[in-house]
């Protein structure tokens, strides 16, 4: 369990708060809008109405005591940038800020953000891959170069073992696990035989995934 400070309760911030709560983390939620704060009260540990661009308000939250600080302010990049910078000045351990464009990400990283989230960009990429393919069932982007996909077993792999196929050496990807009938098995070995009713959980560089699985 981690302690989380979440600033900005728009649609993304609200959904993030709900997910963090489901994962069992303690969440302090902050927004200027009283209605948004009240809506989030049922699924956060605590919530406050306040202006995150005011250093005295942020200082009163004890930002250095949180494991992670999220800045998910929408519609006002200047406020997001100022909040990010102030959090770091006040000793925040780890700051994740929301960006909509690459240029915003650059400014945020230069002004205190340890990481940047692109919710719209990441969702768009996932949706483009997932819903234009009959054989890709899930896509998780780890960074600009790497991803994990859930993919149907290629026809020429069916009935053969991972060791026989020599997948890691020939394809440059790693089989993390297999799924069958909705159940995931991560205890795969070179002896694991791949069948048509399975899907594979595959980690690799994007260029290798595109080459071997037609992303």
Label the predicted regions.
Residues 1-215:
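Cytosolic regulatory regions of ion transport systems
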